[in-house]
Structures are given as C-alpha cells and as structure tokens.
Amino acid sequence: MKNLVENELWNTRHQFFETMRTDSSANVREAIGYIPWYFNLPDTTQKYEIAWKEIMDEKGFSAPYGLTTAERRHPEFRTRGVGKCEWDGAIWPFASAQTLTAMANFMNNYPQTVLSDSVYFRQMELYVESQYHRGRPYIGEYLDEVTGYWLKGDQERSRYYNHSTFNDLIITGLIGLRPRLDNTIEVNPLIPADKWDWFCLDNVLYHGHNLTILWDKNGDRYHCGKGLRIFVDG
C-alpha cells in the first residue's frame, strides 16, 4: 500500500498526493491528498513535506473560514453549484477534521520544517469558530469558504452531520495527548506560547489510568505550580 500510494498517487509536477482517474491523475490538489499522513504512511523525507505548504497558501487550501476541499487556484473551483453534495472546494468539517488529524501526525511524527504550531492553532480556531449557525453552536454538512454560511444549514440532513472528530482534535492535536501502544505518556500541545495562559484536560481514561493535563503559565490558575503538568490517578 505504501509503495502504491507513493509511486502512483504522488504527482511530481504538483508535488502532491492526488486521486486517480481510470487512466491518469486527476491533476488537481484536493484535501484528500493529506490522508496518507492520517496513517503516518509517507516516508519521513523532505520529498513529500512540500505538500503542506498548500495549507498556508490562499491559492491553495487557505480560506477565510478554514480549509477548502480543493485548491482555490483551480479553474473549476466552486463551479458545480450548491446543494448537490459537490466537493469542488467548499469547506466540509468532515474533510477538515481529516486534514487536521493528518497535520498533527505530520507535526509530531516527522522531522518537518514546514509547519509551526501557529499554523495548526489558527486552523483549529477557524474550525471551531465556523461551527455556529444563526448565533447558536452548530455543525452541518458544508459551508462557504469566504462567508462561513452553512450551505445546507436549514435542512434536516445537514444539522445531523456531527461526524468531524471534534473531541479527538482537541485531545490528541491541540492539547497533544498522543496515543501510543506502550505505557509512555506523550504530551505535545500544538498551542503557541503567547496564546493561552492556562488549560485543563481532566478525567481522560488512558491505558487504564485517569489523566489530568494542566498548563498554567503563571501558576495562579490551578495553584499546582507553573508550566505543563501531568497527573496520573490523582
């Protein structure tokens, strides 16, 4: 599988993993091209890391309300209308969640030089901020990348689209509790030093234990000392 993905799906000209037609590459960068990192599949070489630069490019996937499902520079971007399950560029939280999981894997498990925690944090901010509709918390099918308007927001099929792994992104990505097979507790928050003075992730069941992860910049929020602290069963 690894060899097939790297040899058949990598578009050398676009420097991106792309989907295939029956006889050729689709020749378009799509968010699904980050899925290989969801499984930590690509080699840990610099050859593939260039694909992540598209996350920060406004002609790539970067939009005012988050990450688009197709590159914005493509001539067919958002050309297929609205309301027909089109995946030609609008923001789908399902796809954004996959990309953010892949991004966290890439930042934690690869010796990369492309992304900083500021990039991940900003995309998480946009992901969270977009999940409102008419002033109330909401997650739906897909939204406009420029206005943030939920494209099927008032229809029943959209408002039950809670399939975006929101909790997992907070726990394993933002707070940074990295799942492992052994009994090591690995925590690597992807939060810039100047953003949050404190956070607490409490009552996390992990390998048969109850974890609490605290960040208290000055030590005056939780009164458990300054900095990052991890408590196991207590």
Where are the language model's segments positioned?
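Non-catalytic carbohydrate-binding regions of carbohydrate-active enzymes
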Residues: M1-R21, I50-N210, G219
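An alpha-helical repeat/solenoid feature that recognizes helix-turn-helix modules
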Residues: N27-P42
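A short, structural micro-pattern
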Residues: E30-A31, S164, H207, C224
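Short conserved micro-motifs at the rims of enzyme active sites and ligand-binding pockets
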Residues: K47-I50, C224-K226
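Catalytic-core signal marking the mid-to-C-terminal active-site face
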Residues: F199, D216-G234
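Acidic, glycine/polar-enriched metal-coordinating patches/loops
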Residues: I213
